[in-house]
Amino acid sequence: MNVEKFEGAELHVHVTGSISAALVPWWIHWLREFQPELVVNVSVTPAASRFLAVRALRHLANGKVWVDSWDDPDVPPEVNSGKSGASECFLVFPATLDTVMRLAQGRADSPALMMLQLTDAPLVIADTFPGSNEIVENNVQTLKLRPNVEFAPRVNGVRASNRQTAEVGFNLPGALAAANRMRKEGRSGE
C-alpha cells in the first residue's frame, strides 16, 4: 500500500464516540511510527472515552491530549481561536453522525466543537455513519460548503453491529491524503 505522509509538522485528531474509536490508539501508534517527527495532538469526547483509554493516548501521542469537556483542566486556551498548538490540520477520526450533525448546525457547545467551528485550517471528517437519509445528506452538503472541510475517501469496512460490509470514511491514510491536497490547494476557511 502506497501511503503518503502528512506534509505538515503538526496535526490534531479529534476522536468521537463510535466503536471505531477503539482502533484510534493503534492508528496513533501507526502514525507516530510512520512519521515520528509529526506532532500529534488529540482531543477525545466523553462518549469516545467509553471505547478507549485517554491515558493510553497520552503515552502514544507526542502532543497535547485532552478530554473534550469544559471541566478538563488540560483543554488548551487556544481552542477559543480555532487552534490546537501549531496544528496545520484537523481530523475528526472517527466522526459520528451526532458530531457531524452538530458541526453542520454550527454548534460550539464543547471545547473541540468550538475549535473546529472557528478554525481556518483544513478539516477532514472521517465519518462512521450507521446509515443515511435526506437530513443527513443535507447536513453533509452544508459542511461541504465550507472551503476548509472535506470528507475522507470512503473505504470498505465491516459494521460492528451485524458484520456486514459497508462503506465508511474511517480511513486515516485517505484522510492524510485529503489534508495534503487541501493544503496544496490553499483551502482554508479564510
Swiss-Prot record:
Catalytic activity: [cypemycin](1-18)-L-Cys-L-Leu-L-Val-L-Cys + A = C(3,19),S(21)-[cypemycin](1-18)-L-Ala-L-Leu-N-thioethenyl-L-valinamide + hydrogen sulfide + AH2 + CO2
The UniProt record lists the keyword Oxidoreductase: yes
E.C. number: 1.3.99.36
A single GO BP: peptide antibiotic biosynthetic process
GO molecular function: carboxy-lyase activity; oxidoreductase activity
Function: Involved in the biosynthesis of the lanaridin cypemycin.
Protein name in UniProt: Cypemycin cysteine dehydrogenase (decarboxylating)
